[in-house]
Design a protein with these regions (language model features):
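A polyanion-binding, active-site-adjacent surface
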Residues: 2-149, 153-171, 183-186
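Short glycine-rich, acidic/polar surface loops and turns
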Residues: 171-179
């Protein structure tokens, strides 16, 4: 399977699990052995790349501000570009600017993705059953990009991905191993 083939599957799943007026959001960043693969929950309509009229990349967090604080804080993002993001409204993001942002993500050897690619209109909870439907596809995505480390965000994503109940507040900085297609990945 290729990333492009996964994208076609994600689009089909959007029709089943996501808002029918929005498009699925794929992933973005370094696709060849990134240092860190960040796995978030699922996109919302706040991501302007979910708009059917958007012609740019369909990557996580396009048109948003807060998540970029994290990448700046860990020294994995250009300060000038970070300040430019902070000063822009969502409507100020162009396809060219989104590409510039994700070129910087890739330069810093990061890969950003969501467990569920089904874009919802808002941040309403998504069931474990829906996330589980995406799990084998995320595993294929991870096997293709082959990250050095996986960082999971939130109790639900961590629990579904690791196959056990996880309370992030109780296991901060704890390493979990996850084997995908015969290779073991450290997860935090």
């Amino acid at each position: 399977m290729t990333l492009d083939a996964l994208n076609r599957t994600y689009d089909a799943m959007q029709r089943e699990y996501g808002d029918p007026n929005l498009r699925s959001i794929f992933y973005g960043g370094c696709t060849e052995s990134p240092d860190i693969c960040f796995v978030f929950m699922n996109p919302t309509g706040r991501n302007i790349a979910s708009d059917p009229a958007w012609t740019g990349i369909r990557a996580p967090w396009v048109g948003t501000k807060n998540i970029w604080d994290l990448f700046s804080a860990i020294g994995r993002f250009d300060e000038r570009l970070y300040q430019e993001i902070k000063g822009r409204k969502p409507s100020d993001w162009s396809p060219a600017f989104a590409k510039e942002v994700y070129t910087e993500v890739a330069r810093n050897r990061l890969f950003l993705t969501n467990l569920g690619k089904c874009t919802q209109a808002d941040a309403a909870p998504v069931s474990n059953q829906v996330y589980s439907a995406y799990l084998s596809l995320l595993e294929q995505e991870i096997a293709i990009i082959d990250p050095k480390v996986i960082v999971l965000f939130g109790n639900q994503v961590s629990s579904v991905f690791l196959g056990r109940s996880i309370s992030v507040s109780r296991c901060r900085k704890t390493r979990f191993d996850r084997t995908i297609l015969g290779k073991t990945y450290p997860c935090f």
